[in-house]
Amino acid sequence: MYQDQDFQVFEDQTLAGRLGKIQKQIDPKFLITAGDLEPVLAELSVPIYQHVSQHRRRTKNPPTDTWIAFSTSKRGYKMLPHLEIGFWDDRFFIWLAVLQEAKNRQGLLGQVQLADVLNLPSTFECGNDHADKNCGRPLTLTNYQALMREQVNRHAEWQLGRNFMRGSDLFTTTPDDQAAIIRDTVAALLPIYRQLIAD
């Protein structure tokens, strides 16, 4: 489903052109992924709502990335722990994120069990800035502890997930295998997401 040619939408340097290509080529695939993830997200036992990026604030420069987010609110996701799946011009990403807009960010992150974080596969990364495609670092104890120390800063962010670079096997495998990789990645993050949204 997701293919190398999907990255070509970012070669259009006009706002209208890139938005049109995103809406026509990528957004429908995001919705298919959302449907495919419904059984996985149902394991959280709370309603999860999808939010396809609209890029409404863009008036001049075309978006440098595009995504679909999943959160516990119909109204939005940036102020809540959420899952984000999307594209930069050179990679496909799957992140569990707590952004700077989140209420009580440090309190939420205090609910996360370190053992569960370190049990994630070695292909996972941690990051500190959703607006920086290069923010991901290997998910090691040292890197994760450094990420947690940053959380005292007002504008700190927290991400766990995976990046799949353009040209990687994800884009040459069968659609079924690709969907399974995405499902497995999200499923691996669910125990931590569950901790973040616990009352």
Swiss-Prot record:
A Pfam family: DUF1054
Family: Belongs to the UPF0637 family.
InterPro entries tied to this protein: UPF0637 (IPR009403), UPF0637_domain_sf (IPR053707)
The name this protein goes by in its record: UPF0637 protein LVIS_1261
Originating organism: Levilactobacillus brevis (strain ATCC 367 / BCRC 12310 / CIP 105137 / JCM 1170 / LMG 11437 / NCIMB 947 / NCTC 947) (Lactobacillus brevis)
SUPFAM superfamilies hit by this protein: YktB/PF0168-like
Lineage, broadest ranks: Bacteria, Bacillati, Bacillota, Bacilli, Lactobacillales
Gene3D superfamilies according to UniProt: Protein of unknown function DUF1054
Superkingdom assignment: Bacteria
